From Swiss-Prot:
EC category name: transferase
Pfam families in UniProt: IspD (PF01128)
UniProt cross-references to SUPFAM superfamilies, sorted A to Z: Nucleotide-diphospho-sugar transferases
GO biological process terms on file: isopentenyl diphosphate biosynthetic process, methylerythritol 4-phosphate pathway
Protein's name according to its UniProt entry: 2-C-methyl-D-erythritol 4-phosphate cytidylyltransferase
Length: 238
């Protein structure tokens, strides 16, 4: 099994240095993500899509960490979708299951990864999700409108997992049809494949804003000392 890490984004909403290269504890966020997957026995390969101008630097840094799971660092594309495409091409041939995980989502627990893996083995595609908890309303800049039902609404997380041939086909179709999507689930659903929802955790958040970064720094000591506390027992219902 392989995990693809699209890490070529610039982190404009957070500002400053791209979030995946900021230090969280003793290592950059990207390294913490890779360490999470290195601890999982089913994951044998990791491919990172880095900024094109930083491929050599990122390769040197990751190799210096002694990460046995690291297979390749490739140049990313102009957006997340193209970065996943580039990383997918570097996956070794024998691999038939592929996970895609955000480079700025460091608090993914082993039990959550395993749940996605099992769902992919059963049905072919799966993603971590968290039910929407907040009240939702339509509206514009001037006034609030009606409440939107939260029933059946989910916030998408990663990892998202797929049979390799499904994901490859989905990206080929997207390129042929000039289809853009914000995650790989949408591309696979475009092929009429079902994607299984797997309970995620609110702690498995993506670092996007300054508030997210502050929260990540606050949670880091707990994750460092006892990452099992972040497993499915700390899921969206908690």
């Amino acid at each position: 099994m392989a995990v693809l890490i699209p890490a070529a984004g610039g982190g404009r909403r957070l500002g400053g240095r791209p979030k995946q290269f900021r230090a969280l504890g003793e290592h950059p966020v990207l390294v913490q993500v890779l360490l999470s997957f290195e601890r999982h026995p089913a994951v044998g390969h990791a491919v990172v899509a880095a900024p094109e101008s930083r491929v050599t630097d990122v390769t040197d840094r990751l190799q210096a960490e002694g990460l046995s799971v690291l297979t390749a660092v490739v140049g990313g594309g102009a957006d997340r979708q193209s970065s996943v495409q580039h990383a997918l091409r570097a996956v070794p041939d024998p691999v038939n299951t592929v996970l895609v995980h955000d480079a700025a989502r460091p608090f993914v627990a082993a039990a959550q990864v395993q749940a996605v893996v099992q769902a992919v083995r059963t049905g072919g595609a799966a993603s971590l999700v968290v039910p929407v908890a907040d009240t939702l309303r339509r509206g514009d800049a001037d006034r609030l409108g009606e409440t939107v039902s939260r029933d059946g609404l989910y916030r998408m997380q990663t990892p998202q997992g797929f049979r390799r041939e499904w994901l490859e086909h989905a990206h080929r179709r997207a390129s042929a049809e000039d289809l853009a999507a914000t995650d790989d689930v949408a591309l696979v659903q475009h092929l009429d494949h079902d994607v299984a929802p797997v309970p995620g955790s609110r702690r498995n958040f993506k670092i996007t804003t300054p508030d997210d970064w502050a929260l990540a720094q606050a949670l880091w000591p707990t994750w460092r000392d006892a990452p099992e506390r972040f497993d499915l027992s700390s899921s969206a219902s908690s």
